[in-house]
Structures are given as C-alpha cells and as structure tokens.
C-alpha cells in the first residue's frame, strides 16, 4: 500500500487496472461520487502511472495505491479485504505474444478467479462489477444485425481463424464465463458490463489503445479501418457512470451491454469530415462495400433498469477525445491534403488491431 485514505460514508471500493484508460476515469468518477477508492497497479513506484491518480480531486483524502498483478496468485487479497465493492477492469493485452494460451489467456482467467476467491474470503464485498468486452459477444462465423446479453463469442472460431487480437477475445470470454460460474457456485453478487469501442477524454499521457482505433480516420491508420467498418461506440463517461449505476442498483444482475451508438465507417467518416474539415479524412475504403448496414449492440437491458446515456450524438462522443489528443500532442492540429507525411499513432506492442475495452 502506497498511501493511506480516509473513510467515507459511501464505503471503500477497489478498482483494478486503475492506471488504464477506463480504470483511471472510473477512479475519478468514484471519488466524485464520494467513495473511498483502493487503486491497484502492477508497479506503485511508477510515478508516471500513479501521479495522475493522486492528483485527482479527493485523492489525498480517499485514494490509496496498492500493488497487485493478475499473474501473481493472491496478490489482490490484501487490497480487497474490507472493501464493499470491487470493479475489475484490468486485463492483459499482448497481441505479439509467442505463447498466447499461457501468456494472455491463462493469466486472464486465473487472475479473474483469484479476484473472485479474494472477494469470497474477504466476506465484505457485496457486489463485483467486471468490465468485460464486446469481444465476448459477437465473434462468430456470420455476423447478426443485433447482439445482446444472450450472445457469446465462439472461442473455437477465434482459435481456428486467429484474427488479430484473437487471444484477447478468447481470454475475456473465458474469464467472464468462469467468473459467472464461480459467482453462482459460491453465492457472490457479480455483474458484468460489456462496453463497445470506448471513446472520450483521458487522464494518461499516452494514447489509449481504443482511441488509436477510434481516431484512425484522422491519423491515417489504415490497418484499423476494418475494425471501424461496422463499429459500436460508448463514451468513457457514460461507461463509468454505468459501472457505478450497476454497482449501486440492487436490481442489477447478470450481463449488461453498454453501447450508445452504432455506425458504419462511411457514416463515421462523413461526420468527421463535416465536424473537422482541418483533417484529411478518407472518402473511399478499398475492400469495404458502400452499402453496409450497421451492426447494433442492444443496451435495452441496461436502459430498462433506468440508466440514461448522456452523450447523444457522435459529435458529442468524439469532441473531447480529439481535443484531449490535441492538447497532449498525440495528434496534429490539422493534416495536409492527402495526409502525406503523417505517421500513424500506435500503442507499444500493437500490430494490426486494438481492442477498446
């Protein structure tokens, strides 16, 4: 444990993967909501990861940093002990792994069960919220027009085809299924939230992987166009609000898709060209047909529970993300006609695709 944190009326909750895109924003929202937060990171000595968290309003009084690693059995036990809630966001992402079964899939699933076991042993955790992924829902031989919580990715298909990021899809799917089974067997209250491609502002200094994909039409990162072909999106703020909503709502149970927009690459490109004429956004996409129909992820279950999305348009979703990237110098303020000379932005270790959640 790095620093102490005072108690709060809302109680103490844990956030895993707290230095990441979603985790850091969730920490901020929980502090704003009045919770005392324990944030886990793999290396508390890494000031570049922890300082943005400790600089958040309320952090001095109600945030503490804890060392924990999904690859180390039992490393979350101390951090979870005494918490009333656990938000599990952390997940290994290594698309270049030479041994994905043992380096990505196994630690993801075993880390999930280790956290579930720690929650059971703590005896104080009233609910666990697991941040899953759209990759647990729609990876299969043939795409359907609509997906919901009843849909599951075909892991055998992923292992056979080995599309870019296949190990991530498999690991998240198996981890979620294992967690749901463990919760049912041991009487734990587990809710899983399934975000689509996450867009929004961010705290960290580097470009979040999901924004490398979401802003590919601006940066000229052509390998990501296939991901944007029929894409579903959620604003980071809406996602974190939904996580807290599901934690606090007594009626919440099971899986919840969290997605507010679906669009084809053509619709997204048209919006970006109109909204940001200073960028050279492509108009044609070789190999992608012009008459695409969107593929929808239904958030009806979440909305029927009473949750309302605040970001109503694509413009609302992208404005803060683009502004933050500009302010941090991660994308240029404009690109010349044709986009010549602009280097694509990539995350460390990234190959041809990046997964949002």
Curated annotation (Swiss-Prot):
InterPro entries recorded: Epimerase_deHydtase, NAD(P)-bd_dom_sf, NAD(P)_dehydrat-like
Segment forming the signal sequence: none
GO molecular function annotation: dihydrokaempferol 4-reductase activity; flavanone 4-reductase activity; oxidoreductase activity, acting on the CH-OH group of donors, NAD or NADP as acceptor
Enzyme class: oxidoreductase
Pathway(s): Pigment biosynthesis; anthocyanin biosynthesis
EC number: 1.1.1.219, 1.1.1.234
One of the protein's GO biological processes: anthocyanin-containing compound biosynthetic process
Binding site for NADP(+): 49, 168
Catalytic reaction annotation: a (2R,3S,4S)-leucoanthocyanidin + NADP(+) = a (2R,3R)-dihydroflavonol + NADPH + H(+); (2S)-flavan-4-ol + NADP(+) = (2S)-flavanone + NADPH + H(+)
Keywords (A to Z) from UniProt: Flavonoid biosynthesis, NADP, Oxidoreductase
Pfam family, one: Epimerase
Its job: Bifunctional enzyme involved in flavonoid metabolism.
UniProt-listed PANTHER family: DIHYDROFLAVONOL 4-REDUCTASE (PTHR10366:SF720), NAD DEPENDENT EPIMERASE/DEHYDRATASE (PTHR10366)
Similarity annotation: Belongs to the NAD(P)-dependent epimerase/dehydratase family. Dihydroflavonol-4-reductase subfamily.
Name the record gives this protein: Dihydroflavonol 4-reductase
The species this protein was found in: Zea mays (Maize)
